[in-house]
Structures are given as structure tokens and as C-alpha cells.
């Protein structure tokens, strides 16, 4: 997503990035102003990192203004001290601000030095920006999420597969697909869609990074949906189809996997095909219930009639109807005949 915003650090910030790694700087605040990353303020190390945390971070957090906080921790890694990157994007921020900060974070990490950033925190409430909030985030991050009944069944199935001696474990375990990681902007867009911010999202897989990124988040009419489907690359799409069925108003979320024939490379086709199952599961983990999953090769297929038929297929009476066979044609009244006597 950093390639889409074009926002980069200004000269002052780049210069400070080189200086702040000398071990004396504890925290710095960076914001997006006038389409560039700017240094807002910074503070030096006072005490150990836990005692400095609330004292130095709290004054930097403004109620409704997003920013990035880079906080130096006290343990070292091969490149020097480890740093925490906090993205402060409050719920009250505008949709544009949320998108901008989510999609620019990769650029910030690159220009600061990704190797120095060992921990990340996305904060949307002031409680999450405190030391207690950070510690809770660490606990939650390291605790496995509870499994649904379906996930528990799959976990048990995998255990069974691993114990078999047929030599086909790898193949069986890959039948579920490849679980590609998602960019922060993807998670934010899913969160915003669940809250009613968008009715359409488009995603792409970075084949080199093997990561799913957000391409577009918008509100579009159904008539404009076909035009969103690329003709040269595969994509994933989420669309909220608003319609009526049997007198009820429905808002059904449709997951669309578009693959424009053989104009895509073999690797691209394989990646999108393998990742679609796990990615749709990730979408549902973010609170979006997918009503229908579709695969198309042409955007023209996405008409109102098509979506309605896919969501509510007509019930067909499969019982064969046989007409009662007609009786033989009438041959008049029956006649009784007496057997002739044998002479």
C-alpha cells in the first residue's frame, strides 16, 4: 500500500531517523502533514522503558488526531536497540485518515529501518496506548485465539493425518490452501466494512511478498461493480449486495474470486486459488459473515439477476411427473358368446 500513497519522510525526519538510533532517544512522534511524514516531537531516555512509557507516551496522544509513535525498548537485537511502532488511529478519525495511516505505515517502517522494529501495536482507544494496554496486547497476541467447532474438527483431522504412514501428509495438509498474511490496511478495511463504512473492498496478493494487500475500499452501486473487475490480474472482492427476497430486505456479503482466464501467470493462478479458502475464513474471523462465494472470469457476470439467483436459487421440483396412461380405445359393448357344442 505504500506504493499507492506516495507519502515519504521529509528531510528533517530522515536525518533524525539516523540520529535517534544512538541509544539516547526514547520516543518520537511522527504524523502525516501536507502529504509527507514529519517529525512532531521527541524525548530522550529518562529511566527504564517501563517507567518512561506512560510519562512520555501519554502527552503525545491527541484525542482525535492519528499519529505514529516509535518507542525505544531496552533490549538489544543485532541491529541495536529494539523499537516498538505504535499506530494511533482513534475510532473518531475520518475514513480517509484511517486509510492513509494504514497504507503509509509500510513506508515509515522502510525508511526508519524495518530491522529495528521488533514489535507493533495498533491502538484505537487511549487505554491501548498505556503501558497496561501494551502489556495486555502482548498477552493477547501470544495467546491462541479460541477455535470454532469447525476449526477444532479440522485440527483433529490434521492430527490424524500426521499420524498416518501413507506418505501423503503434505498433500493432505495443503488441501485446505495457503494462509497468506494480510496487511494492516486489509484488517482496517474489514473492520470499517463491518461498521458500515464501505460496501465494496478489493484485495490483491503480492506474489513476491506472498501477502494480501488492500487495493480499493469504496461505496459503489451494483451497476458499477462489473467495472471493478480487472481484465489482466486476479483479485479478491467483497461486496454487500442489498436486495429484497420474499418480502425481506437483505444485505448479503458476497466474496468474489476473479481470474481473467489464462492471461495471468501460472504462479498467480495457483496463489489465488490456494489462498482464497483461508482468506475467506480470515474475513469471517473479522466479523463479516460471507453469504456466498463466487468464482468468475468476467466482470460482466455480476448482474443483479446473477447475484440474486446465486444467493436464492429457485427450488426445482425434482419428482418426475408421469401422466396416467390412456386406456385402450373403446370397442363397443362386451358380448357374451356360448361355446359351441361338439358334435
UniProtKB/Swiss-Prot annotation:
Keywords: Actin-binding, Cytoplasm, Cytoskeleton, Repeat. One of its GO terms (molecular function) is actin filament binding. GO terms for biological process: actin filament depolymerization; barbed-end actin filament capping; positive regulation of neuron projection development; regulation of lamellipodium assembly. Its main location: cytoplasm. Transmembrane segments: none annotated. It comes from the Eukaryota. Residues 4-139, 177-312 form the ADF-H domain. InterPro entries: ADF-H, ADF-H/Gelsolin-like_dom_sf, Twinfilin. Residues 314-343 are annotated as: Disordered. One of its GO terms (cellular component) is myofibril. It is found in: Cytoplasm, Cytoskeleton; Cytoplasm, Cell cortex. Interacts with G-actin; ADP-actin form. Belongs to the actin-binding proteins ADF family. Twinfilin subfamily. Actin-binding protein involved in motile and morphological processes. Inhibits actin polymerization, likely by sequestering G-actin. This is Twinfilin. It comes from Anopheles gambiae (African malaria mosquito). The lineage of its organism: Eukaryota, Metazoa, Ecdysozoa, Arthropoda, Hexapoda.
